[in-house]
Amino acid sequence: MNIKQEDDHHHSHAHGDNHCHCGHDQEKAADAIVRDPICGMTVDPQAGKPSLGHGGRIYHFCSEHCRTKFAAAPEDYLTAKDPVCGMSVDRSTARYFLKAEGEKFYFCSAACQAKFEADPAAYRDGQRPTAKPAPKGTLYTCPMHPEVVSDRPGDCPKCGMALEPMGIPPTDEGPNPELVDFVRRLWVSAILALPLLALGMGPMLGLPLREAIGEPQATFIELLLATPVVLWAALPFFRRAWASVVNRSPNMWTLIGLGVGTAYLYSVVATLAPGIFPMSFRGHGAAVPVYFEAAAVIVALVFVGQVLELKARERTGSAIRALLDLAPKTARRIDAEGNESDVPVDDINVADRLRVRPGERVPVDGSVLEGQSTVDESMISGEPLPVEKSKGDPLTGGTINKNGTFVMSAEKVGADTVLSRIVDMVAKAQRSRAPIQGAVDRVSAVFVPAVVAVALLAFLAWAAIGPEPRMANGLLAAVAVLIIACPCALGLATPMSIMIATGRGAGEGVLIKDAEALERFSKGDTLIVDKTGTLTEGKPKLTDIAAFGRVGEDRLLSLAASLERGSEHPLAEAIVSGAEERGVPFVEVTGFEAKTGKGVQGIADGTMVALGNSAMLADLGIDPAALSEKTEALRGDGKTVMFVVFDGALAGLVAVADRIKPTTAAAIQALHDSGLKIIMATGDNERTARAVAKSLGIDEVRADVLPEGKKALIDELRSKGAIIAMAGDGVNDAPALAAADVGIAMGTGADVAMESAGITLVKGDLTGIVRARRLAEATMRNIRQNLGFAFGYNALGVPVAAGVLYPILGLLLSPMIAAAAMSLSSVSVISNALRLRFAKL
């Protein structure tokens, strides 16, 4: 397909309608495009061309014919649909426009235009479906500048790169059009650069090509070969360079644009008008040297780096796509008449009844209404054994039904499901910024101006005191300095590591909310953990009953268990289960009241019953001394004791034990080895807590801690200079998770706990914390290595390119070698970041 791009190079910079919230003006009035809405030609409003007012605006036309056509049906020519993203584009101000096979196409951004140019047939002829428009409310961000956020697609105003959608990506997005386009441009530039290299470097390699062809003819051939590379293949680079200048955000594209543009324009003038150059520009034989091969090879090598970067970024999304693939695409819905039909999962509503057959994935979160089965929940819990499910049991979308059929009720759908929240968390984390990036940004802000200054100084120094041809050598040194300096490596150092680390973490059940959590956890020195559910199984069992006075054990357990049926605490469930196993009857309870961190009370079978810990007894003014010996013995065995009070008098106690998880001891040792001090903060009494802590080697115990006491503990430790990570799983833990330097939500837990935490573990045990710690340390180590590569490379490369080694070794770096080194620096950073995919967690 023949594509004709309209000549708007002098206008090509970041899309002015992008609504980016980054503090930069999107366009200046002087740069506004005025386009004939009929034929698409650009029009100078001051040139006296025909114009027409409509809808409060003035439209300008290239000719009276176009004006007449517009006047007949103006509404038909006001806007056009972007064939790539489907957005409506104002035809009279469209910045991006081209013609293909006689048709006119308008685009909202350079990114959409590049996608169209990469595969016009896909968007023009409808040979395959175009990408679905992003969901309403989708925000877009720059992969290199995550602080840039836009409410529509387009180009980054800082660097000109295509903005990418934030949040959950589509699962059927297909190949990245930008990658397809860049690969095509790479092939063209590489194929044309090879003969340029042969012509330009032939004399150094003993190839008499220039002599055989003739110097003037060889130079014109170089001009013909280099022009498509610079003016077509490198066009995206120049657009980004122009965007950086217009928006006063100098970056790597500024340097590349200056370097390639300078080498090419100088060579064109040297070819077409060599007589204007003085002797200081002329080499052997009084010929003016040209650098077409340098310009073309630089472009090809930059494309190598860009293609590798795009492929690496594409691979980092594989973790998200793997999670998305866990969700089924359809579900079997049962209507009010009992008829069943397959519907897209997106069409499921809360309270819908769904049938799940053996081997199918549970479509959304909900609970069992009818039937029973076993469900593989390993994607959430990490446990390999299927879990039995019957009426009333909860279900998580994406888990696999093994051997039975059941009917479920949908309770959480769409973005509210556990799986969707996990995917959204991973996607946002990959776009987040680590605090260390702030230091990099401050360096980058002065880096590009400093490099331009060094290039200018290098040129002046060579021109003043360099050997002949000193002006040509000065130009060579200046171009080499511009090209070798690579802020790209600096820009990639942190984001690439964060993207890969968050994806790797998701695959290991460690969900990172943002990059700051990783950096803080790597520096943390103190970890606060709860006992129940974190160190222990979280499934306590009733072990002992001790009645006091004339109250029988069955009566004691009956009233205590009846009261606890109103509580959701794991210890309450243990007492209720124990009563059911013993066949003790339950009675009616009224006036139930829960005392946070203390216990419960209410009226059971006409008796005022209270059940709780020592704090509950203190509130009631009851002395537990009569049962102190029994209490201490049970606590010494690591059991949790709860006192039972009937009508204001001590009636007895019940004891519950929670088995320590098999993985806990090894995990605590691993956390100790990583330099963490471990503090157990629990609502249990001192004796029980210390018994558990001693068996596990925990450093410090804080017992009888109420939920609000955990936040006070964090404040106390922080005042001593500690960097604190806090692990919790419930609503009561949310304030402490938010107050800690790093909050760690254990298991899928409560929604508010996940929102308050920087890290969420899909499996609620210490092994997940070990993985998170290792991931955090590996990520920060990787970032420091990347920054070392980037800073070290520039510290060495820029002086060498400027020519500091020439007086010693007679070495003047070619811009081609500089471009190769620049690409190598980016490749080294990307390759090093990719090692995180294989880090031992």
Curated annotation (Swiss-Prot):
Keyword Cell membrane carried by entry: yes
Top-level EC class: translocase
Chemical reaction(s) catalysed: Cu(2+)(in) + ATP + H2O = Cu(2+)(out) + ADP + phosphate + H(+)
Localization of this protein: Cell membrane
Keyword terms, alphabetized: ATP-binding, Cell membrane, Copper, Copper transport, Ion transport, Magnesium, Membrane, Metal-binding, Nucleotide-binding, Phosphoprotein, Translocase, Transmembrane, Transmembrane helix, Transport
BP-aspect Gene Ontology terms: copper ion homeostasis
Transmembrane residue ranges: 186-206, 218-238, 256-276, 285-305, 445-465, 474-494, 602-622, 638-658, 742-762, 800-820
The EC number(s) this enzyme carries: 7.2.2.9
Membrane topology: Multi-pass membrane protein
Main location: membrane
Gene3D superfamilies reported for this sequence: Calcium-transporting ATPase, cytoplasmic domain N (3.40.1110.10), Calcium-transporting ATPase, cytoplasmic transduction domain A (2.70.150.10), HAD superfamily/HAD-like (3.40.50.1000), Ribonucleotide Reductase, subunit A (1.10.620.20)
UniProt-annotated catalytic positions: D530 (4-aspartylphosphate intermediate)
Induction cue: Transcriptionally regulated by HmrR in response to Cu(+) ions.
Top-level division of the source organism's lineage: Bacteria
InterPro entries registered for this protein in UniProt: ATPase_P-typ_cyto_dom_N (IPR023299), ATPase_P-typ_P_site (IPR018303), ATPase_P-typ_TM_dom_sf (IPR023298), ATPase_P-typ_transduc_dom_A_sf (IPR008250), Ferritin-like_SF (IPR009078), HAD-like_sf (IPR036412), HAD_sf (IPR023214), HMBD (IPR045800)
PANTHER family: ATP7, ISOFORM B, P-TYPE CU(+) TRANSPORTER
Function field: Involved in copper efflux.
Protein name (Swiss-Prot/TrEMBL): Copper-transporting P-type ATPase
Protein source organism: Rhizobium leguminosarum bv. viciae
Encoding gene (name): actP
